[in-house]
Amino acid sequence: MPPAPKNGSAANAWRSERNARPREVWRAIVPKNLMADDTTRRLLAVAGQLQTLLFQIELLKRCDPEVLVKRALRAKIKHNALMVLYLHSRLAGDLAAQAAHRLTVGIYCLWMWLRRACSEAAALANEIDTYATYRDKDRFFSATMNLSPGGTCRLHSLVGLSLYGRTQDVTRELGLINDAENLLKQINYCHLIVSTESAEAALVGVDEFLTATVGGGMVASPETYDHTQPCCICLDELSVTANQGDTIYKRLGYSVCDHLVKQVKVNVTPDDVLRHMPFLNSVDANTLRGAIDKLRGSSGGEVGGGRRLAGVVPTGCRAEVGRSEQEDGAPAGDDRADLEHEARASRILDSYDVFTEAPGPVYRLSELRYWLASGKAAGAKTRGSCAHATHQATVLQKLDTDLSAMFARAETFERECRSAEREIFGTSFAHFHRHVASKIASVRGVGGGGEALIDKLLAGSPATAPEAEIETLISSCYSHHMSLPLFSRLGNPEKADTDALVEILKSYRDQTRPRADKAGGRAEDGAGDCDDEGYPGAADATRRGQRDWIGRVRVDTAAVADEHEDKVKKLLDRAERDLTTRRKNYAERLSARSFSNLDRCVKNQRAELEKLLRVNVYGAALPAMYVELKNGFLARQAFMKAVTSDESQHIRRCRLAREDVEGYEQHQYVRSALMRTSLDPAALPHLASRFYELVSGPMFRRHVERFPQPPNTSLYFTVENVGLLPHLKEELASFTRTYAHAEWMVSEFREFYDFSGISGVSETQRAAYAYIREAVFAAALFESIFQCGRAKLMRADSVEVDAGGPLLTDGIYLTFEERFPLIAIWGVGEDRRLCATSVVVTEKDLYAVLYAVLHKQDK
């Protein structure tokens, strides 16, 4: 095709010729990849618009219905609802056909959002009309927010799953998206004993639940998920990271799932909210400017400029101001008490000498004084940098004090918003959070202050971003821990010394008080011998201590001190230096370890806190899991439809009757030949890998990825994600360790993959494993004995499917369907489709289908 002219009459002629060409010609001219890219772009644009509409609908549900009725929004909402219905009429047929053929994550999300947008937009438009008639806000919010007490919760549904054999149907209740994820993993594990029809019915229920949750838009409601339950991606991540000696299950217990719903950092300031107040676009500019000027004059500052209204000082701010004023003033009472304790201790110690029998508390007091004196110099240097304020409040009181300023800002912001609305619009809007504020406050009042505090944190506020709440809570956590005695001693050693001094003085006082009581009539004399502080017994103890237990007379201690002053001073200096070094090293090591543990603990709790308070949006993990599992059963369904369809021209041979004498002879011929030859034990590892490939679920196909992993990895994730019991995992691992014919040859004539008479999920699953093991071992022996080529075993749910159907190759397919478990195909065309020369043999006997493969050239 010649290039398009740039301009002139030739360009016009070229455009006319282009428009005259039929669409099929243009499809032939335009490359397919360009058409696919254009379609993808269009679908992404539609998906983005649907997601935006769903988010706006969620906002309008919480808006004052008077605004929706009086202003032009009512017509716009109905217009959007009609546009969504138009899109549904144009796309629903193709999307439904695509969902029944093969899915991608993008197509499935678009299909979910389109269905949900139709129902939500129509419901909102109807409720607005109802409110325009009855003017009942309670009714409007109850209907839009699904708060009716007698109504059914759309987030609770029952999903049933039928299994092979006499096993009763399994029923699961879906209330959280975690429940849906667990059910998908369970179906993935039990795919060997689930028919296509049963899986399709169960997946329809899961699809409806996902449409009601994930299909509702971006933001995930807190009642739809539980971040403490790990998902399959959590297990995958922990499987490739260092375990630090802990088991995978212990580490999963401490994990915070961020895959089903992903947290998003939202830093919105009150200025941003005020700057983007709703409905301002419809307000006249002069009216808006005049209202802003009036609000500035009444508040004494800028509206939305970060300043508070004049005269409003939050409770928490007043507490901080009072605390700072107290710190800037005279020394606190605690410091004066410390000085008094030290003076009293000095007077008590001075009343005892080597000739005086001192009680036990005095010795402890002397030792403490020694340690205090040796560490005094180091303590004086670190007093200013390590001192911390002592918090006397309880944890909740301290937390409430720290958060009061933040809550006060939210209340002030709410008052400013109401003032702005009254000034601009003439009324204050009764949005959802304001309409139910009194009810929420009454519920909070029943639980007490602690529950009200937690409720405020979880509910949040337009004036406070989640990040600000998180930082405030973390700061409060550090402040609380630093106020504990352990960290106070690490941060301020002198505080620990003072506490020990007080304890020793108290103990000494308790021991000396009984002596003063026994004095009786000598109380007045004893009072005269008290020290200046009135400490009883000090002077009396001095008089009674003139002679000790060996009868030594008091000596002149001053002369002794003068004689040995130099030696003692050198010894004390050396001991003090050594002691200072040891204390410093010990304190540094203990402080580093303690603060490291505290930081690690706070870091772990911070992850929990961030997940709880941040805005969470639905991730792509759950839709991707649904798509992978659904595509597996869709591939099995497409395969069965292709080989059993009457429209195909291939040769079909269906052998299912048990009265077939010829088939029985074929069965006996192959079975007898296999029983005369034993399996090579060296081939067991390879056969085990083939077994793992066939039994692993369609959701985890790690062995067929671009960078394939061993097949046992796929099976590992299949069984670990459902919490399979250890003895069942050991039994599954040992399935391929035996090679005796009597143990692995389990099927009789035309009874392959027959579960009649078997009940229980574990027993049915065990029988399916036994049948597949028999197929793997029999095919390997068949190849080695008859030398007729490879008897390739394949899975029907692993075939590639395109617009024309499944792409096949010659071999034996395991369908995992109880009615048609084995299908042998040969003679596939070059395009990997069934043609007139293709032969399809449907069997229920393993050895008869091997006989058919052996004689395929004769047929």
From Swiss-Prot:
Organism this protein belongs to: Psittacid herpesvirus 1 (isolate Amazon parrot/-/97-0001/1997)
HAMAP family in alphabetical order: HSV_TRM1
Subcellular compartments: Host nucleus
Record flagged with keyword Zinc-finger: yes
GO MF: ATP binding; zinc ion binding
Recorded family membership: Belongs to the herpesviridae TRM1 protein family.
Region listing for Disordered, in residue ranges: 512-542
Basic and acidic residues bias spans: 512-525
Binding site for ATP: 782-789
Zinc finger annotations (C3H1-type) as residue ranges: 231-259
The entry's keywords: ATP-binding, Host nucleus, Late protein, Metal-binding, Nucleotide-binding, Viral genome packaging, Viral release from host cell, Zinc, Zinc-finger
Name under which the protein is recorded: Tripartite terminase subunit 1
Cysteines paired by S-S bonds: none
Function: Component of the molecular motor that translocates viral genomic DNA in empty capsid during DNA packaging. Forms a tripartite terminase complex together with TRM2 and TRM3 in the host cytoplasm. Once the complex reaches the host nucleus, it interacts with the capsid portal vertex. This portal forms a ring in which genomic DNA is translocated into the capsid. TRM1 carries an endonuclease activity that plays an important role for the cleavage of concatemeric viral DNA into unit length genomes.
Subunit structure: Associates with TRM2 and TRM3 to form the tripartite terminase complex. Interacts with portal protein.
